Amino acid sequence: MTLGDKFPRYLQQPPVCGVVCNMEHNRPAETLVLPPRGWRITPRHALVAALVCWVGFAVTVWMVLGNQLGSFDSAGLQYFRAGPDAVPWGPPAVLEAVRDWTALGGVLLRNLFALITIAALLLVRLRREATLLAVTILSGWVVNTLIKSLVGRPRPTIVSHLAEAGGSSFPSGHSFNSAVVYMGMALALASLSARRGVRWSMIAGAALVTALIALSRVWLGVHYPSDVLAGWLGGMGWALTASAMLYRPARDLADAAAPAIEAATPGELTG
């Protein structure tokens, strides 16, 4: 049985992406088909979802600047602590698990995953999606940094910090940037699947993972609940806005850089 007999949906002729599989001698080469241009969330749907996120973000900012969320923030921070000494829930293993989870939103891991995703998209010739992801992440980092400097909210002191954290508190950088990176990755990688359920599962998974990263920052006592709420909403809003508004600039940039990328990417892999 040949590879074509076993996986007929994915093997066709003639070559499309240049990845050639010759599994048997004296037989025509078969080509692994990868999408030259995959699925993309429609700009209208992306902008509607982004608008919902931005409205929630704006309301949170307004309430924080008006000092209207003091009770909410205090209760949220103390919710994960027990007793008069405000010790965290559970055994030490729980604390380590939360620290490991929050690391997914840290600079090292989120950028490492982003670089791997961008490289994979370039490998399968989805240059526009790769460029859009890079532009989304870089611009999102700039936006979060600017908002932090403008608001200048100090870190909470209601409970002890269980992880190292520096800089301003609002909005949460872990929450904002992880939402930008992981939702941007989900939207880009969804272009590789022809199945609606797979695509939306990836998007929902990114939303859940980043929401838990945001929650971990409150659990560790380094952010107010309003910090992470605004960060998550803002990051989601930026990823969706970029998907709708920056696709064409990213396409033009990718097309302009195509000759250099083609020269650096192997044209064919023969077996």
Kindly label every feature range from the protein language model.
Residues 3-109, 151, 155-162:
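N-terminal transmembrane-helix/juxtamembrane module of multi-pass inner/ER membrane proteins
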Residues 70, 74-77, 81-84, 113-196, ...:
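Membrane-interface loops
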Residues 63-67, 149-150, 192, 218-221:
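Transmembrane helix-loop junctions and nearby membrane-interface residues
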Residues 51-56, 112-119, 134, 138, ...:
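Generic alpha-helical transmembrane segments of integral inner-membrane proteins
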Residues 64, 123, 150-151, 246-249:
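Helix-loop junctions at the membrane-solvent interface of multi-pass transporters
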Residues 44-49, 62-63, 111, 118-124, 130-135, 200-207, 217-218, ...:
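Hydrophobic alpha-helical transmembrane segments
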Residues 3, 7-8, 156-271:
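Membrane-embedded catalytic cores of phosphoryl/pyrophosphoryl-handling enzymes
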